[in-house]
Design a protein with these regions (language model features):
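An N-terminal assembly and electron-transfer interface module characteristic of large anaerobic redox
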Residues: 1-183
Length: 183
Protein backbone atom coordinates (compact mmCIF):
# COMPACT_ATOMS: atom_id res chain seq x y z
CA UNK A 1 0.00 0.00 0.00
CA UNK A 2 1.32 3.41 -0.89
CA UNK A 3 -0.75 5.27 1.70
CA UNK A 4 -1.03 4.04 5.26
CA UNK A 5 -2.30 6.93 7.42
CA UNK A 6 -3.46 6.46 11.01
CA UNK A 7 -6.25 9.01 10.55
CA UNK A 8 -8.43 9.45 7.49
CA UNK A 9 -10.27 12.78 7.34
CA UNK A 10 -13.33 12.81 5.08
CA UNK A 11 -15.20 15.94 4.10
CA UNK A 12 -17.97 16.75 1.70
CA UNK A 13 -17.94 18.93 -1.39
CA UNK A 14 -20.58 21.05 -3.08
CA UNK A 15 -21.69 18.09 -5.22
CA UNK A 16 -21.87 15.55 -2.40
CA UNK A 17 -23.84 18.06 -0.32
CA UNK A 18 -26.23 18.73 -3.21
CA UNK A 19 -27.03 15.05 -3.73
CA UNK A 20 -27.36 14.59 0.02
CA UNK A 21 -24.50 12.26 0.91
CA UNK A 22 -24.85 11.26 4.57
CA UNK A 23 -21.30 10.88 5.87
CA UNK A 24 -22.42 9.49 9.22
CA UNK A 25 -24.32 6.64 7.56
CA UNK A 26 -21.68 5.99 4.89
CA UNK A 27 -18.82 5.75 7.37
CA UNK A 28 -20.85 3.77 9.93
CA UNK A 29 -21.78 1.25 7.23
CA UNK A 30 -18.15 0.99 6.07
CA UNK A 31 -17.10 0.33 9.66
CA UNK A 32 -19.84 -2.29 10.20
CA UNK A 33 -18.79 -4.07 7.00
CA UNK A 34 -15.15 -4.16 8.09
CA UNK A 35 -13.98 -1.82 5.32
CA UNK A 36 -12.07 0.44 7.71
CA UNK A 37 -8.75 -1.22 8.57
CA UNK A 38 -8.11 -2.16 12.18
CA UNK A 39 -6.46 0.66 14.12
CA UNK A 40 -7.44 3.36 11.64
CA UNK A 41 -9.54 6.32 12.72
CA UNK A 42 -11.97 7.96 10.28
CA UNK A 43 -13.17 11.45 11.13
CA UNK A 44 -15.53 13.48 9.01
CA UNK A 45 -17.38 16.75 8.63
CA UNK A 46 -19.55 18.62 6.19
CA UNK A 47 -17.84 21.35 4.16
CA UNK A 48 -20.37 22.50 1.58
CA UNK A 49 -18.83 24.84 -0.97
CA UNK A 50 -21.86 27.10 -1.09
CA UNK A 51 -21.83 27.90 2.64
CA UNK A 52 -19.22 30.36 3.85
CA UNK A 53 -15.72 29.98 2.44
CA UNK A 54 -12.57 27.91 2.86
CA UNK A 55 -12.45 29.29 6.41
CA UNK A 56 -15.80 27.62 7.16
CA UNK A 57 -14.50 24.27 5.92
CA UNK A 58 -11.31 24.64 7.98
CA UNK A 59 -13.39 25.47 11.06
CA UNK A 60 -15.63 22.44 10.50
CA UNK A 61 -12.65 20.10 10.21
CA UNK A 62 -10.96 21.52 13.34
CA UNK A 63 -14.26 21.08 15.20
CA UNK A 64 -14.34 17.47 13.94
CA UNK A 65 -10.97 16.89 15.65
CA UNK A 66 -12.63 17.81 18.95
CA UNK A 67 -15.74 15.76 18.18
CA UNK A 68 -13.84 12.57 17.36
CA UNK A 69 -10.82 12.78 19.69
CA UNK A 70 -11.22 14.96 22.79
CA UNK A 71 -12.09 13.01 25.93
CA UNK A 72 -12.34 14.01 29.56
CA UNK A 73 -11.18 11.83 32.41
CA UNK A 74 -12.32 14.53 34.87
CA UNK A 75 -8.65 14.96 35.81
CA UNK A 76 -7.65 18.51 34.83
CA UNK A 77 -4.09 18.91 33.61
CA UNK A 78 -2.12 22.14 33.83
CA UNK A 79 -2.07 22.46 30.03
CA UNK A 80 -3.49 25.12 27.73
CA UNK A 81 -4.97 24.14 24.36
CA UNK A 82 -3.90 26.45 21.54
CA UNK A 83 -6.47 25.96 18.79
CA UNK A 84 -5.11 27.48 15.62
CA UNK A 85 -6.98 29.38 13.02
CA UNK A 86 -5.81 30.08 9.50
CA UNK A 87 -2.10 30.61 10.19
CA UNK A 88 1.26 29.96 8.62
CA UNK A 89 3.47 27.28 10.20
CA UNK A 90 6.00 30.00 11.07
CA UNK A 91 3.31 31.88 13.05
CA UNK A 92 2.44 28.69 14.90
CA UNK A 93 6.11 28.09 15.66
CA UNK A 94 6.45 31.60 17.11
CA UNK A 95 3.39 31.13 19.34
CA UNK A 96 4.84 27.85 20.60
CA UNK A 97 8.16 29.60 21.26
CA UNK A 98 6.48 32.38 23.25
CA UNK A 99 4.48 29.86 25.33
CA UNK A 100 7.69 27.94 26.07
CA UNK A 101 9.44 31.16 27.18
CA UNK A 102 6.58 31.70 29.65
CA UNK A 103 6.87 28.04 30.75
CA UNK A 104 3.29 27.31 29.68
CA UNK A 105 2.58 23.70 28.71
CA UNK A 106 0.45 23.58 25.60
CA UNK A 107 -1.24 21.30 23.13
CA UNK A 108 -1.40 23.03 19.77
CA UNK A 109 -3.84 21.80 17.17
CA UNK A 110 -3.73 21.70 14.28
CA UNK A 111 0.06 21.93 14.49
CA UNK A 112 1.68 22.26 11.09
CA UNK A 113 5.03 23.63 12.26
CA UNK A 114 7.07 20.56 11.40
CA UNK A 115 4.89 18.74 8.89
CA UNK A 116 4.34 21.63 6.45
CA UNK A 117 7.38 23.79 7.19
CA UNK A 118 10.13 21.32 6.39
CA UNK A 119 13.44 21.86 4.64
CA UNK A 120 14.11 20.62 1.13
CA UNK A 121 16.40 17.63 1.60
CA UNK A 122 16.11 16.03 -1.81
CA UNK A 123 14.31 13.03 -0.28
CA UNK A 124 10.57 12.51 -0.64
CA UNK A 125 8.76 11.94 2.63
CA UNK A 126 5.07 11.12 2.23
CA UNK A 127 4.37 11.64 5.94
CA UNK A 128 6.69 14.25 7.41
CA UNK A 129 7.20 13.98 11.16
CA UNK A 130 5.38 16.44 13.35
CA UNK A 131 1.86 17.54 13.98
CA UNK A 132 -0.43 16.93 16.90
CA UNK A 133 -0.46 13.33 18.09
CA UNK A 134 -3.67 11.37 18.58
CA UNK A 135 -2.79 11.08 22.28
CA UNK A 136 -2.53 14.86 22.58
CA UNK A 137 -5.84 15.34 20.74
CA UNK A 138 -7.52 12.99 23.24
CA UNK A 139 -5.84 14.84 26.15
CA UNK A 140 -7.30 18.20 25.06
CA UNK A 141 -10.41 17.20 27.01
CA UNK A 142 -8.45 17.32 30.28
CA UNK A 143 -6.73 20.65 29.64
CA UNK A 144 -7.20 23.55 32.01
CA UNK A 145 -8.20 26.09 29.33
CA UNK A 146 -8.34 26.66 25.57
CA UNK A 147 -7.32 29.67 23.54
CA UNK A 148 -8.81 29.85 20.06
CA UNK A 149 -6.59 31.91 17.79
CA UNK A 150 -8.77 33.54 15.13
CA UNK A 151 -12.53 33.89 15.67
CA UNK A 152 -13.83 32.53 12.37
CA UNK A 153 -11.71 29.39 12.42
CA UNK A 154 -11.68 28.35 16.07
CA UNK A 155 -14.76 29.49 17.94
CA UNK A 156 -16.86 26.45 17.02
CA UNK A 157 -14.11 24.06 18.13
CA UNK A 158 -13.74 25.92 21.44
CA UNK A 159 -17.50 25.79 22.04
CA UNK A 160 -17.60 22.07 21.17
CA UNK A 161 -14.72 21.29 23.54
CA UNK A 162 -16.44 23.22 26.34
CA UNK A 163 -19.76 21.43 25.72
CA UNK A 164 -18.13 18.00 25.49
CA UNK A 165 -15.42 18.20 28.16
CA UNK A 166 -16.11 21.42 30.12
CA UNK A 167 -12.86 23.09 29.07
CA UNK A 168 -13.38 26.86 29.35
CA UNK A 169 -12.00 29.05 26.59
CA UNK A 170 -11.33 32.46 25.13
CA UNK A 171 -11.12 33.27 21.44
CA UNK A 172 -8.66 35.97 20.41
CA UNK A 173 -7.58 37.64 17.20
CA UNK A 174 -4.67 36.18 15.28
CA UNK A 175 -1.67 37.98 16.83
CA UNK A 176 -0.60 40.06 13.86
CA UNK A 177 0.65 43.52 14.77
CA UNK A 178 1.51 44.97 18.17
CA UNK A 179 -2.05 45.48 19.43
CA UNK A 180 -3.20 41.93 18.67
CA UNK A 181 0.07 40.43 19.94
CA UNK A 182 -0.11 42.31 23.24
CA UNK A 183 -3.70 41.24 23.79
Amino acid sequence: TVYNPDIIAVHTTCLSETIGDDLTSIISKADEEGLIPEGKKVIYCNTPSYVGSHITGYSNQVTALVKFFSKSTSRRRNVINLINGWMEPSDQREIKRLAKLMEIRTIMFPDMTDSLDTPLTGKYNMYPRGGTTQEDLVATGDSKFSIGIGHDCTENACVKLDEKCHVKYDVVDVPIGLKATDR
